[in-house]
Amino acid sequence: MLCEQILGKLEEMDVSGRRVEYVEIQWHEAFKKIHRKITDQGREVGIRMDDSVLSRGLFQGDVIYADEEVVIAVSTPPCEVIEISLTEGHEMMAAKVCYEIGNRHAPLFWGENDTYITIYDEPMMAMVSRIHGVRAEKKMAKLDFDKRISAAIHNHHH
């Protein structure tokens, strides 16, 4: 089966009477045009998107196939993240946090309750933890790409 476009969001579609299958797309795969995946029901799926996916991405709830019997949607699994918060009186350190994370080309998201979220790796955790007035905590979380701050999300390292 070949899926070549995003048909909409699962929560906005009427899927009654149809089986919903999910294909897992990791956060770092979301902006790739070509995938070969297996749904949670064992169906092999080829995904070949146009160039719009390079900036839009594939995310939780995106429907990539639908017929009268089955709907296939994207599932973005939780991943290790760093939740960053600023201690009282150190709100001005937000600019430094954003600069340092951006300088490493890492994705950055708004979190809950005045926090920021970025992808976990040990060098990033060490760097963020050294910034005065900043608390960093490692967690497992689903990324909400509607809350991304970064202009582009990609897996680029220096």
Task: Explain the meaning of each model-derived region.
Residues 1-54:
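Intrinsically disordered, low-complexity, positively charged segments
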Residues 2-20, 41, 114-158:
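Helix-rich terminal scaffold detector
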Residues 36, 84, 115-119:
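Generic recognition of long tandem-repeat/solenoid scaffolds
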Residues 55-58, 64:
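Short, well-ordered loop/turn sites that connect or cap secondary structure elements
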Residues 58, 86-101:
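Short amphipathic alpha-helix segments
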Residues 74-87:
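Short glycine-/aliphatic-rich beta-strand segments at the starts of folded cytosolic domains
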Residues 98-111:
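Residues forming anionic-ligand binding surfaces in small-molecule and nucleic-acid pockets
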